[in-house]
Amino acid sequence: HRVDRRQRQMCIRDRVTDGAHPIYPTATGNLHHEVELVCAIGEDGDIIGWAVGCDLTRRDLQAAAKDKGRPWDAAKGFDQSAPCGALTLGALPDPAAAIALTVNGQTRQSGRLDDMVWSPVEVLEKARTLWDVQPGDLIFTGTPEGVGPLVPGDRVEAMVAGLSPLSFTVRPR
């Protein structure tokens, strides 16, 4: 499908560190995964490092909000909604680096960073127009095609070539 580059959905997230296992959230029957490159903001306000993240989305709540023209905050911003791997300090990974996600060993998402609609720098520039970006902030930068559902017990492996991978199991409520 075609993406309208004029519109961007941004939201505040609750991060889960690598090794932690998020609990399947309340108020949904349709939790989805979205592997993303995450940028970390340093003391000077610039990007100082990178990590692999997984944007967890209550897709049924998102669809209902879209239908009513409402924000997606309840669909995106919930406890443990943003598992994030270990931070790697330094320059942006190779723009042609692979980004992928598997669920129970089956590939669900596979792409390259240069296939993204917006570059990490563009995402950061837009975030700065909406919020006071602070040192320590983590900004998720978008996902390749192939997002899909998760259920309790699913084992998720997410990766961006050159970065520490992210692994977690969705725990039942």
Identify the role of each PLM range.
Residues C11, E34, A161-L163:
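A short, compositionally biased micro-patch
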Residues R5, H32-E36, D46-I47, D79, ...:
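Short connector loops at helix/strand junctions that flank enzyme active sites
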Residues H1-I12:
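Single conserved hydrophobic/aromatic residue that forms the stacking wall/gate
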Residues A51, R59-R173:
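Catalytic-pocket segment enriched in acidic/His residues
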Residues Q7, E34-E36, D55, N104, ...:
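Acidic active-site catalytic centers that drive phospho-/nucleotidyl reactions
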Residues R13-D14, Q80:
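Conserved double-stranded beta-helix
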Residues E34-D60:
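RNA pseudouridine synthases
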Residues V16-V35, K66-G69:
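Short acidic (Asp/Glu) patches
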